[in-house]
């Protein structure tokens, strides 16, 4: 069982020199505006730390959170950072992710050696948006051998049972979701515990 021993806000950065020192592995959370990024982070960490922006697209800040997870089964305690990036795709005409994030944010993703895992949140109701395809391509083009990219589907509980099953069958594995009520889902779908275990496994594969 994974227990979140600590989770707290570190800092917000708009320039590289403002970012915390790269002393521990880091997980980046990215996704379109209104995809449910804050909800996912708060569910994952068991604490209301991430706030939704009142003006999507206006603030180009990266928010850093320090977290400590205990894997009781394996008697392992790990500290790492979660980086919450601003939502993309807020413009009426979607630009490329690289264009929206040119400057600080793109530089952060390109050069920060402590980033080990990218979690791309995708709205389960809107699977084929160009901006998400572009984001996936851009992030995968950045990946170093010691980094991983995973998709995670938000708003899974907004789908009917047939839609949930179809997504489960066709989505890339590992199949990861966020939902308001994990316990209300069929047992074939991942629980919050499984989501945490999966993310921790990827982070520990290539420690800093």
Swiss-Prot record:
Residues at which Mg(2+) binds: 38, 59
Assigned keywords, A-Z: Cell cycle, Cell division, GTP-binding, Magnesium, Metal-binding, Nucleotide-binding, Septation
GO BP terms: division septum assembly
GO MF annotation, one: metal ion binding
EngB-type G domain ranges (all copies): 23-205
Pfam families given in the database record: MMR_HSR1
Reported function: Necessary for normal cell division and for the maintenance of normal septation.
The keyword Magnesium belongs to this UniProt entry's keyword annotation: yes
Residues given in the record as GTP binding sites: 31-38, 57-61, 84-87, 154-157, 182-184
Cellular component terms per the entry's GO annotation: cytosol
Cofactor dependency: Mg(2+)
PANTHER family noted in UniProt: ENGB-TYPE G DOMAIN-CONTAINING PROTEIN, MSS1/TRME-RELATED GTP-BINDING PROTEIN
Keyword Nucleotide-binding: yes
Family membership: Belongs to the TRAFAC class TrmE-Era-EngA-EngB-Septin-like GTPase superfamily. EngB GTPase family.
Gene field: engB
Record-linked InterPro entries: G_ENGB_dom, GTP-bd, GTP-bd_ribosome_bio_YsxC, P-loop_NTPase
Protein name (record): Probable GTP-binding protein EngB
PROSITE patterns reported for this sequence: G_ENGB (PS51706)
């Amino acid at each position: 069982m994974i227990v979140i021993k600590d989770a707290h806000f570190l800092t917000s950065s708009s320039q590289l020199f403002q970012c915390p020192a790269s002393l521990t592995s880091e997980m980046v959370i990215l996704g379109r505006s209104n995809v449910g990024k804050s909800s996912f982070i708060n569910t994952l960490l068991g604490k209301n730390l991430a706030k939704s922006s009142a003006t999507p697209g206006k603030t180009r800040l990266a928010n850093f959170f320090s977290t400590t997870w205990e894997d009781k089964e394996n008697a392992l305690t790990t500290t790492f950072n979660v980086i919450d990036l601003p939502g993309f795709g807020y413009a009426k005409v979607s630009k490329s992710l690289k264009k929206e994030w040119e400057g600080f944010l793109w530089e952060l993703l390109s050069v920060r050696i402590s980033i080990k895992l990218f979690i791309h949140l995708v709205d389960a109701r809107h699977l084929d948006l160009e901006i998400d395809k572009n984001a996936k391509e851009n992030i995968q083009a950045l990946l170093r051998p010691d980094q991983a990219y995973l998709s995670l589907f938000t708003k899974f509980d907004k789908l009917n049972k047939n839609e949930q099953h179809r997504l489960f069958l066709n989505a890339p594995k590992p199949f990861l979701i966020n939902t308001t009520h994990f316990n209300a889902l069929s047992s074939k779908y991942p629980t919050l515990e499984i989501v945490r275990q999966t993310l921790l496994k990827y982070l520990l594969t290539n420690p800093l």
